[in-house]
Amino acid sequence: MSQPIYKRILLKLSGEALQGDEGFGIDPSILDRMALEIKELVAMGVEVGVVLGGGNLFRGAKLAKAGMNRVVGDHMGMLATVMNGLAMRDALHRADVNAKLMSAFQLNGICDTYNWSEAIKMLREKRVVIFSAGTGSPFFTTDSAACLRGIEIEADVVLKATKVDGVYNCDPAKNADAVLYHQLNYADVIEHELQVMDLAAFTLARDHHMPIRVFNMGKPGALRRVILGEVEGTLICDQKLS
């Protein structure tokens, strides 16, 4: 049997991925499938950290444009990621996976407050650690939180799960001739203005040489193939374009 090429990963799941075709909220079947795919990684010996977005429940930036104070909106968005984290923890527990939910700010009685050394300890014990509430500060996206937590826990890679197969030279939804890149370096992404994640998050990953792999979580088995080093999605790292 093939062996994982990564020992420890940070998996970034968007809130939209959890809603499936529902358009809002959480699709239980999607949640359970993701939990089973994560369970498979744990069984392979991979240490898994997870960061969840909250866009399926709330988008602070969108309401800020409509007049809401941006700080208030972002705080509400952070709470949405905690709600998604609670749902993911429950799904993992139902799948017999030991999981711990941590929040960037105190939510006594609901989940633990983020503690770096405790998170490392639990990962080494093969417990899935779910990081919620983003970075704990407004104006930072959950992509920034994913890169930050990935760097802090010394993950081998940040895996960004999306609804597309990877990074294209243009929008595949608008152009049938869009080309999928299999590997890019950080400079390529900036030079060609490719949409991987927001610039603050991407720059953080680049400055700390944190590889990012973008893949389609909707494809059955895609996460497993990524972990085993098979050709899946787009890898962004220090190496040149290929």
UniProtKB/Swiss-Prot annotation:
Q: Which InterPro entries does the record associate with it? A: AceGlu_kinase-like_sf, Asp/Glu/Uridylate_kinase, Uridylate_kinase, Uridylate_kinase_bac
Question: Where is this protein localized, as stated in its record?
Answer: Cytoplasm
Alphabetically, the GO molecular function entries are: ATP binding; UMP kinase activity
Give the reaction(s) catalysed: UMP + ATP = UDP + ADP
Q: Which NCBIfam families match?
A: pyrH_bact
Q: Which family does it belong to?
A: Belongs to the UMP kinase family.
What is the protein's given name?
A: Uridylate kinase
* UniProt gene name: pyrH
